[in-house]
Amino acid sequence: MKRSLWILLMMVALPVGAPIANAQKVPDSRVADLVRAGKVRVGLFLPQYSKDPATGLAGGVWVESARAFSSRLGVQLAIVEHSTPPEAIACLKTSACDLLFLPLDARAADIGDFSNPIFQIDYTLLVPVGSSINSVADADQSGVRIAAVRNHASTNELSRQLKRAKLVYAETPDQTLDLLRTGQADVMASTRFVLLPFSDQLPGARVLEGRYGANINRMVVPKGKGGWLAYVNEFVEDAKASGLVQKAIERAGTRGVTAAPPGNSTGQ
């Protein structure tokens, strides 16, 4: 991941180890097995985390939210790093991870249960200098090539809406940007969170104001872990009600990420 995106992610991070509530003195029976294990393994994929080039440690809003959850549990945090969402989903399926952060995803629905929303990130487009494209409708024309990350939720949503434009796939956000930079694509599709810092790398590039959907991030627990899900939902609602997530985002001037509304009000 490019250094500018790493800097952005690190700027929005919550204070290291910041708890949302006091760590458990007596283990909650719903998560007693996690407490006994002494750690919670949270699977993240790019760009949910970034690596400090000096220390090699993962950082970012998702990392710090996971750290706050582990602090509430009173256990250590183990970040399990992946390059793509399918890799993270496989991690949960094989019990190599305990939790993920994902939008509602049919690929994970049979192996995991989803919490209330915690983050919201709009889906939109990045266009290079001189482009006449000002909306998704403008981009959906014959001959237009839209670079997108394969199997990403933003890509899946866009593919359902496109009628004429062609998707050109890459495996990571950085590779997708390279397709646009080298003229192998006319537009790049992703989340506003990813596209805004990328636009800084392309003089004159624009991130469109409109959106074609949103990534409503939720925490995901393995199927059959109803106690975990109830506990996670309490954590999520405490985080939103306290303003902790949104205040951290605002304090750092983060672009493209907001705290989700209270409850499960997105309807997704």
Give, region by region, the residue ranges found by the protein language model.
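Ligand-binding clefts/hinges and TM-proximal coupling segments of bilobed small-molecule sensing domains
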Residues: 24-26, 153-170, 207-208, 237-268
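Ligand-binding cleft/hinge of the Venus flytrap
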Residues: 51-54, 63-76, 115, 140-142, ...
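Hydrophobic residues within well-ordered alpha-helices
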Residues: 69, 92-93, 139, 179-181, ...
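Flexible hinge/capping segments at coil-to-helix
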Residues: 118, 127-145
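Short helix-initiation/N-cap motifs at beta->coil->alpha
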Residues: 78-90, 134, 168-182, 215
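Periplasmic-binding protein-like
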Residues: 46, 119-130, 192-237, 255-268
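A ligand-binding cleft/hinge motif common to bilobed small-molecule-binding domains
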Residues: 86, 102-111, 181-213
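Extracytoplasmic small-molecule ligand-binding "clamshell" domains
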Residues: 23-103, 108, 169, 242, ...
